[in-house]
Amino acid sequence: MRILLIATNRHRRLMSRMNAQPVPIGLAYIAGHLDPDRHQLKILDLMFSEDYLADTEQAVKEFQPEMVGISLRNLDNSSYMDPQWALPITKEVIDKVRSVTKAPIVCGGPAFSLLPKECFNYLEPDMGVAGDGGETFAQLAECIESGETHRNLPGMVYRDNGAVAFNGLAYSNFARPPRLDELDMARYEQSGFGIGIVTKLDDNFSHSMDANSDGNSWRVLRPIEDVVAEIQEMKDRFDLRKIFFIDSGFNVPLPHAKALCQSIIESDLKIHWNSYLAPVPAACDEEVLGLMKQAGSGLVIMKGVAGHDLEQEALSTRMEPVQEVCQRCDEAGIHYVISQFFGEPGWNVLPRPVVV
C-alpha cells in the first residue's frame, strides 16, 4: 500500500526570537514502524516549503497514496509577541489532500494527542491516532489494506453515529528507529536545538519527581545502549553532532542519567546536546552535572510550576527548588533557560513577582 506522511509544522522560531526548526521526529518514528516490504512510503515535510499547499497537491497527485497520515506538532507557536494558532495550516493541508484523493486521512501528533476530540472536530480527518502512535498506525495500515475493523486499536479517534469516539492514548516502546532518509537532515542540523532522540518519557513533567525512582514510573524508558547506538547511527549516516534528548527530565532517575552520560563519554561520541532538566535538587548533585558537562551538555530547559501546584503554596515557595538547581547549574557551567507559563488552568490569583 502507498502511504504518504505529511509533517505540517511550519513554525520556525521559539517565542518569536530563537531559531527552532525541529525535525518531525514523531512522524519519522511512525515511518520506522511501517513494514517496508508491504508498504511504499513517502514523507512530505512542509517546514521548508515555499508553497505548502501547492507542494501538498503535487505530492498527492504524483504519489497517488492509498493512505495519508497528517502530523500536527503544535497547537500554537508558543509566542507572547506574535501568537499564531497552528491548526488552520493543518486544516488547509487536509482540505487540499481531500480535494485530490479519496484515500483515508489519519491525523496524529503531539498537539493532536493533547486535545484529540477537539482537534478531530476542527480538522475533520477520517480517523485519528492519539498518543505514541507507531504501533497503532502500522496496525491501522494493515486494517485498511485488509478491510478489517480498526475501532478497537489503542489511541484511535473516529466518528461513531455523529459523535467523536476516543479509545484512550496509545503507547509505544519506540523499539524501531526513526526513518530519516527522506528528511533534509543537513538543513535541520543548522536549525534549532538539535536532532531529537527519545530517551525516556513520563505522563507528566513535575518537579515532584523522585530522583531515584525506578523505570516503572515512566511510560518510556529506553535502554541506554539503544540510545547510544542511535546517536552513533545519526553521526555515521548524517554526520550529525547536535542532539536534543526528548526526555521529561534528563536527570531523573538520577542513576539512569549518570549511566547514560558515562556511556556517552566512554563511547567517545563527541556530541553537543540539549534536553529538559527536572528542577529537583536531589537529582542535581555535583557528580551528575559534571558528567553532563563532560558528555556534551550545552543547554538545559527547566519547566517551572504548574497552576494546579499553587493551591496550597505560594509561588515563591514552589520556585525555591528551581532557584537552587539554577545556582548549581551556574556553578557547573551548564547553560539553562526556565520555561514558566502564567494564567493556565489552576491559577486563581495573580502572583507577586519572583526573582530567580
Which residue stretches match the model-derived regions?
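Structural beta-sheet core signal
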Residues: 5, 70, 107, 275, ...
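Short Asp/Glu-rich motifs
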Residues: 15, 53-54, 117, 254, ...
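Charged helix-capping and loop-helix junction motifs
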Residues: 83-92, 258-259, 316-321, 352-355
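Loop/helix-junction capping segments adjacent to catalytic residues or to phosphate/diphosphate-binding pockets
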Residues: 50, 113, 251-254, 282-283, ...
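Acidic, low-complexity intrinsically disordered segments
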Residues: 1-232, 237-239
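Residue-level marker for beta-strand->alpha-helix junctions and adjacent short loops that shape enzyme
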Residues: 10-11, 75, 112, 135, ...
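Catalytic cores of alpha/beta
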Residues: 116-122, 288, 345-356
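Radical SAM [4Fe-4S] cluster-binding motif and immediate context
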Residues: 22, 177-335, 342
